[in-house]
Amino acid sequence: MGLMMTFTPTQKELFNKNIEALSNILLKESLKQIQSSKFELILGKDNLDINLKDTSDNTFLYENVIDELNTMLNTYNDKYLLYPVLYFYGFGNGILFKALLQNKNHQHIVVFEKDIEIIWIMFHILDFSHELQNSRLMILQTSSLDIEFFSNFCSSKPFFQFSRIYFLELMSHYYERFHEDILGLNKKLAENFKNSIVSHGNDPLDALQGIEQFVYNLPQMITHPSYKELLSKRKGISDTAIIVSTGPSLTKQLPLLKKYASKATIFCADSSYPILAKHGIKPDYVCMLERTEITAEFFNHDFGEFDNGICFIIKSIVHPNAINYLTKKTDNFTIVSTYASFIQYLKLDYFGYFNMGFSVAHMACYLSLHLNHKNIIFIGQDLAYAENGNSHPDDYQNSANYESQTYEHILTEAYGGKEKIKTHHVWLMFKRNLEQDVQKIQKYLDTKVYNCTEGGARIEGTIEKPFLWACENLLDKDLNKPFEKLEPLSLNKQNEFLLKAYYKVYQSIKHCRDFNDNFIKVYDKIKNSFMSLQNSQKNEIFIQEIIQDIDKTKTQIDELYNTQKDLIQILGPLLTQFELNLARIYVLNPKTKEDAFNKSILWIKEHLEFMELVYGHIKAQENALIKNILPLEEKLKERKLDKWMERVRR
């Protein structure tokens, strides 16, 4: 039972003022509900000597309030003076935050608190309204943070930009009792920051491969049925989608899948397509998303009649081999894009976009949503190793233990929640990504997501049911299969899009050249100024001028996001990685003139290296476009559109 606290009318007024300024609605409501507390307020002679005693075990929030405050302040004003974001576990008496926020370099202090009675008392004692108003002081109750919070927080400014210098500070020894909570929170933040970095693209070469393969695949995309055609003919014709992945648990579900195949729409991963063919289970859709050559091999089969009526849905950046294999066996495929700046620059919106996540099962999940399914059932979605160590079913094309030794094993919660199971970091990333979306689907849409894998890792937010239950309860009537055939555009329309694509790619080659011609001049100017620094008396003025030139150049690169979307896809990952690493230099706190000089030199050197990379990447894009525009040129010649091509080139 808590102690009844008596606050004066002035203190109650102060509490309300603080509550008013608090933007966290959940926390606001929780604080208003509190009537009593297990804490006793202990005030010393000094105004800053405010402590709390936990009457449940007679421990104190601080052992020595003033000493601990001064130690913290000295450390933070020395080591962390320039940090834009600081993280604390525990609100304490809050005085530290008021002191630190007098430093304008600290844009936000993020405080995580498990026991909000502490905040409740302190809100009666000190005025935090100014710090709370513009979210410079952010208070979060750890028990109320969900998947959506972590993914949004860790990908937003300025938290994401400074994620490489993130660390969590304990307010005082008192909080060590919550070590489980602290470790869990720290792990979630670190994982979500890592996830955000990956989703921003962490490899420019990856982006370049995407652009190359997209341009190479353009003629096939334009001359086959579009995503728009798919939606117009197939939306809403079935209530239940079964998504077939290639985890070790798939094998045991195949007999049931075969029995109920006529009553659900079956979406299968590229890797489970040969397995279903072997067992005579015809999927309605086969999805492919990855850009590698080995993935393309899942289509290197001649299954004859089996392929009739199957619709292949292919991400536009897959390896060209995948499409070559398909053209030999069927014309029933649709090439569709995800949102990416180079792809959107071409404005081939008719061929559609949808977000596809990181895994092929995730892509199938989105596709089934866009086709208005009310129930989505996952099978074979283990995202973990089987008990015997296998990563895939026995029938898997690349062997059942294909990924068994590739990555370090990590433990995660198993399906059913009773035990732990082995997985690896890539599967964990797929799992987290899927969990974020499943949570949103169940929250905002009238769609239920079931995990009927009956094995593997637990996917938070899905409804875990036996596959038999799902078949018996959700699948009652036969669907009219095969579904209506999809048609490509008329030849005239195709020609129009082929020419439009050719024009845009050709323009992009020109953009690369123009950008680099300009860029090299700026780079040379900065480099020459830098070289003459070493022997100049006017170093400080000179350094400021160089840094101003660098800032101008960075502004020009940032403007590409609005002016030349075709260049930003390859520069995006480069920029992200550069800014994340630069944060470490940004926060160095120079004590002497020499320190300041060295920091500036380091800053300029980093930017010169970055500029060399920018130049190199744009050059690589130019070369890639020149090489991969060839299939488009062939197609235009084949259709006797040479003179129009000439016009574009002129």
Predicted regions and their residues:
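N-terminal donor/sugar-recognition subdomains of glycan-related enzymes
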Residues: 2-241, 248-265, 274-278, 285, ...
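Short, basic, glycine/proline-bearing loop/turn elements
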Residues: 82-86, 239-243, 287-289, 343-354, ...
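Glycine-rich phosphate/pyrophosphate-binding loops
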Residues: 113, 272-273, 280-290, 368-395
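Generic beta-strand/beta-sheet core signal
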Residues: 245, 269, 289, 313-315, ...
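Long alpha-helical, hydrophobic tracts
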Residues: 256, 264, 346, 350, ...
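Extended, hydrophobic alpha-helical segments in both membrane/secreted and soluble proteins
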Residues: 266-272, 286, 312, 361-364, ...
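Active-site/ligand-binding-proximal alpha/beta "capping" segment
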Residues: 320-379, 383
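Phosphate-binding loop/pocket of nucleotide- and phosphate-handling active sites
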Residues: 390-437
